[in-house]
Amino acid sequence: MFAIGLTGGIGSGKTTVADLFGARGASLVDTDLIAHRITAPGGLAMPAIEQAFGRGFVAADGSLDRAKMRTLIFSDDAALRRLEAITHPLIRAETDREAREAPGPYVMFVVPLLVESGNWKARSDRVLVVDCPVETQIARVMRRNGFTREQVEAIIAKQATREARLAAADDVIVNDATTPDALAAQVDALHQRYLGFAAAAR
């Protein structure tokens, strides 16, 4: 099936844009949602996470203690690689399954770290980047998550640069001070293009 890889930095509006495509019939496969599912109580990744990191990283309800894990992997690259070695194969298997079962005319992989992960770029026929200025990202995440400016800047520093994302893009949606109608118009135009690409690829 024809596949779009949708990405963007934290606070760019990826989820909003993905939902607009979903409302138009695209089949969404969201790696963040899958990551949350496999680290929820009884999730597929939890036994291996507990074995690798200890019971202290499991919350009382049996889910991953996200705040504790976030603190660890932010300062420990080896711990991040250990976590990714557990979660990435499971996320890959789940995304493959969801893509195979997708009923829509095309599938849209929603992948925050698509540019940083070469295999996601290879799995997508086109890469769509949701773009906005860094200052807009910072303001949105501070407002949405209650993070300090320093916390948001640290997250952004761990992600691909805005320039690297734009260089990887086949298509770009600008979501800065865009009105909802203007954003929807950008989505409508690309959705029609993607329907054409998907039909030609069948």
From Swiss-Prot:
Keywords: ATP-binding, Coenzyme A biosynthesis, Cytoplasm, Kinase, Nucleotide-binding, Transferase. CDD domains: DPCK (cd02022). Its EC number is 2.7.1.24. It is an enzyme of class 2 (transferase). Signal peptide: none annotated. Residues 3-201 form the DPCK domain. InterPro entries: Depp_CoAkinase, P-loop_NTPase. GO terms for cellular component: cytoplasm. It is found in: Cytoplasm. It comes from the Bacteria. It catalyses: 3'-dephospho-CoA + ATP = ADP + CoA + H(+). GO terms for biological process: coenzyme A biosynthetic process. Its main location: cytoplasm. Pathway: Cofactor biosynthesis; coenzyme A biosynthesis; CoA from (R)-pantothenate: step 5/5. One of its GO terms (molecular function) is ATP binding. ATP binds at residues 11-16. Disulfide bonds: none annotated. HAMAP family: Dephospho_CoA_kinase. Catalyzes the phosphorylation of the 3'-hydroxyl group of dephosphocoenzyme A to form coenzyme A. Belongs to the CoaE family. This is Dephospho-CoA kinase. The lineage of its organism: Bacteria, Pseudomonadati, Pseudomonadota, Betaproteobacteria, Burkholderiales.
